[in-house]
Curated annotation (Swiss-Prot):
Belongs to the major facilitator superfamily. GO terms for molecular function: transmembrane transporter activity. GO terms for cellular component: plasma membrane. The gene is yhjO. The keyword Methyltransferase does not apply. Pfam families: MFS_1 (PF07690). It is found in: Cell membrane. Disulfide bonds: none annotated. This is Uncharacterized MFS-type transporter YhjO. SUPFAM superfamilies: MFS general substrate transporter. PROSITE patterns: MFS (PS50850). The lineage of its organism: Bacteria, Bacillati, Bacillota, Bacilli, Bacillales. Keywords: Cell membrane, Membrane, Transmembrane, Transmembrane helix, Transport. It is a multi-pass membrane protein.
Length: 401
């Protein structure tokens, strides 16, 4: 065990090791809440379907406007300041959920949590890219995702027990975990932002430098839209698919996390030498099959197969895309590039629940997921066609600056 600790210490930098710890702590408590948030709001707001969807849409809708500012903040003030502020805001929001009773209070707290996420995600990803050699970035992102999945494995099971006992305990534990992470980061987290980056003013001011990452954003929307639906409307759609839907959701969440924990690093390491074109082709095929799987899964076996296929897609694709963006971005715009790309999650999670709720009530859940399967195939073909231009022209141009 001591040998393993020294191996981790020598292989990964201090910011990376701290991120490992924080990811494990917060993923466990966050996973207790994730599968049940929609159901909790659904019950608290007298069985309404659209009101929970509206509240959940507010956070990512606000994030759309906040994320670009957050990327600029992390590039100007530094990664450490942005991360500490983010953790404090998220801890305060989760504490508020313990006492919230009215719809407008839930909405305010959801937006506050979104501000924290908008700051944390680009800052933490930029810090990983700055403190890790390029040859090891995909590995580090994969390990972080695997650690996150480790927390997700146990989180839903504990969350179901707490939800049946008293749901507010879930929020209290999440708030405590975020605050502990904040305290340790305040003591141990170094600043990794370059003190004197080689800034090219013309490059910074030009909108054209963002075109490649905007293209990635656009063609990643179907992926994030699939996640938006599995996190919201699928929770309600599953009521019609399974008699014991709470147990099925819990088993699905735990199984998917376990698949990710086991498969994440081997899949990333095994595909490092593949071209981005091949990686993205595999990724979008897997996501398209998973979307169709959600539409037709009527048994636990089918649902677990869907989870496994989706895990392969996200393990291969999402991790390599993070590394790809770190190569794409000029050093002085790294935080903003991660922020811009991350907008696709906010866009999907702002319009997805509302659009999905309307389709669910009008046409049924199958229509949502079959339509997403078609969109994913189309986006995947488009991205595999254009990705070679980004690899051979844009990255070469940026690296010469």
């Amino acid at each position: 065990m001591l040998t393993s600790f020294h191996s981790i210490k020598s292989r990964y930098t201090a910011p990376v090791r701290l991120r490992f710890f924080g990811e494990l702590l917060t993923s466990l408590t966050g996973a207790m809440m994730g599968p049940f948030m929609v159901l909790y709001l659904h019950e608290q707001l007298n069985g309404s379907i659209m009101m929970p969807m509206l509240i959940i849409s507010l956070q990512p809708f606000a994030d759309i406007f906040l994320t670009l500012a957050a990327g600029r903040v992390t590039d100007r003030l530094g990664r450490r300041t942005a991360i500490l502020t983010a953790l404090l805001l998220q801890s305060a929001a989760m504490t508020g959920f313990v006492f919230a009773e009215h719809a407008y209070v839930f909405a305010i707290l959801y937006v506050m949590n979104g501000i924290g996420r908008s700051l944390y995600i680009p800052a933490s990803r930029a810090q990983i890219a700055e403190s890790t050699p390029e040859s090891r970035r995909s590995e580090v992102f994969a390990v972080i995702n695997a650690i996150y999945s480790t927390g997700l494995t146990a989180g839903p099971l504990v969350g179901m027990l707490l939800y049946n006992h008293n749901p507010v305990w879930i929020f209290a534990l999440d708030a405590a975990a975020l605050f502990i992470y904040f305290l340790i980061a305040a003591l141990k987290l170094p600043e990794t932002k370059p003190l004197h980056p080689a800034v090219t003013p013309k490059m910074s001011a030009s909108f054209t430098i963002y075109r490649p990452v905007l293209l990635l954003l656009l063609l990643s929307l179907p992926i994030s839209m699939l996640y938006a639906q599995t996190e919201t409307t699928y929770r309600l759609f599953s009521k019609n698919m399974f008699s014991d839907y709470l147990s099925m959701l819990t088993i699905y969440s735990a199984a998917k996390a376990l698949f990710s924990c086991v498969l994440q690093v081997p899949l990333v390491k095994g595909t490092e030498k593949l071209s981005m074109k091949t990686i993205l082709f595999i990724t979008y095929i897997c996501y398209s099959l998973a979307a169709a799987g959600f539409a037709c899964s009527t048994s636990l076996t089918m649902l677990l197969v869907t989870a496994a296929v989706m895990t392969v897609g996200e393990s291969i694709g999402l991790t390599h895309i993070q590394t790809f963006i770190s190569k794409l971005a000029p050093p002085h715009l790294l935080g903003r590039f991660y922020a811009v790309y991350g907008l696709h999650w906010d866009i999907s999670r702002s319009i997805g629940p509302l659009a999905g709720g309307l389709i669910l009530t009008s046409f049924g859940g199958e229509v949502i997921f079959y339509a997403l399967a078609v969109c994913l195939l189309t986006a995947g073909l488009s991205l595999t066609y254009t990705i070679e231009k980004l690899e051979h022209k844009v990255i070469r141009k940026v690296n010469r600056l």
